[in-house]
Amino acid sequence: MFDILMYLFENYVHSEIELLVDEDELTKELTRAGFHQADILKALSWLERLADLQESDKPYLCNHAQQSFRIYTKDEMAKLDVESRGFLLFLEQIQVLSVETREMVIDRVMELDEASLILDDLKWVILMVLFNVPGNESAYEQMEDLIFEQPEGRLHS
């Protein structure tokens, strides 16, 4: 399923090509690209729930303190290793993620059918969430820079 999400993001969203709006046509396109029907339906459902998060009239989180600390559940810790959880905290500290967008990312990660997620895959989920939440253009650009920019020169002497 994650491969399909990456395919859609790279080929349609990130490349700014208009996404096919007809789900049947999109399903046929993905089938021609070699993806299985069941995985396609899961990926489209995942994207639909992501869109629902942004379109909801209700705030994603209610009554949260700005200085609160996120405690991960056992299932969340199984899917997000220490490095990934640390990266989420880092993104909050540099204000790429807000408390709300962090929770949206965790929500979308937990809906993936992967047992665990490596950091590079988490970065793509974060990018997908930020792309779909209005008003996060600057955060999206910062996240793009974190993914695509390669450090220049030597890191260590």
Curated annotation (Swiss-Prot):
Recorded coiled-coil stretches: none
Pfam family, one: DUF494
Transmembrane segments: none
Family: Belongs to the Smg family.
UniProt name for this protein: Protein Smg homolog
Native source species: Shewanella denitrificans (strain OS217 / ATCC BAA-1090 / DSM 15013)
Taxonomic lineage of the native organism: Bacteria, Pseudomonadati, Pseudomonadota, Gammaproteobacteria, Alteromonadales
Encoding gene, per UniProt annotation: smg
